[in-house]
Regions:
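C-terminal and inter-domain tail/linker signature
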Residues: 1-253
Length: 253
């Protein structure tokens, strides 16, 4: 069984109550970065036990692999509440040794352009371009953080950019208008630091830290790259709780 299959089965066990996928975790070295879950395998077991069988539905719509890392993009339904999440699993010697995630409440209506937070393509292409596509996203984020906005049009095809963020429309004009509208509501998007860039072929995930309004926030931005341009975007953002409210001391990143 592949690392991707292990990751998907572990997430699905939240729904099924099957404890066998917990055996994919290294009990001696597992590090948890979900700040609402206690550290180690015992902390994860306690979290799973707190979600009785049948109360959570899990649908993983995408899974990608980059070296020792697996990235998944999933829908989680807990009662009447639906959340969208990216999970990152790091593997060593065939076992899961570290986990990060980022969750956002799903909206009840689509984006201004009619897209949902998880729909769209999922099949990997251009695996030979993985390194180039990750480097492209590093350059984009470097320019974004440095405020070099004059370079932005060069990263997009303009009218061929599909946006799955629920508050933002398609294309570069939709992106700019959406961000301006959020800023007027006191919810300006600001990136301060990139922590990880992971990818497989034409899909790249950027894990970053910044502010959403006045809240310290984790940004997970997931891109589909086509012909060296940003063609499609999905994301989740999650406020980082203050230290006194965290269940482990490993940090969000």
């Amino acid at each position: 069984m592949s690392a991707k299959e292990h990751a998907i089965e572990l997430l699905k066990s939240l729904e099924t109550g099957d404890t066998q996928p917990l055996s994919y975790i290294d009990p001696e070295h597992y590090i948890e970065h979900n700040l609402n879950v206690a550290d180690g395998l015992e902390g994860l077991k306690a979290y799973f036990a707190s979600r009785p069988k049948g109360t959570v539905k899990v649908n993983t719509v995408r899974a990608y692999e980059d070296g020792d890392y697996v990235v998944t993009h999933s829908e989680f339904v807990d009662g009447q509440k639906k959340r969208i999440g990216f999970d990152i699993f790091r593997f060593a010697n065939g076992s899961i040794v570290e986990h990060w995630d980022n969750m956002q409440d799903a909206e009840t209506k689509p984006s201004p352009s009619g897209h949902w937070m998880t729909d769209g393509p999922s099949e990997v292409a251009d695996r030979h371009k993985t390194a180039d596509n990750k480097a492209l996203m590093q350059r984009y984020m470097d320019d974004l953080i440095a405020g070099r906005r004059e370079t932005f049009p060069s990263f997009f095809e303009g009218v061929n950019y599909i946006q799955h963020n629920p508050w933002v429309g398609d294309n570069l004009t939709g992106l700019i208008a959406g961000l301006q509208a959020l800023a007027k509501q006191g919810l300006a998007v600001k990136y301060d630091r990139v922590h990880k860039i992971l990818g497989e072929g034409n899909f790249v995930l950027v894990v970053a830290e910044g502010l959403f309004g006045d809240k310290v926030t984790a940004y997970y931005d997931f891109y589909r790259i086509e012909n060296g341009k940003l063609a499609e975007h999905w994301d989740t953002l999650e406020a980082i709780p203050p230290e006194g409210e965290r269940k482990n001391s490993n940090g969000k990143f």
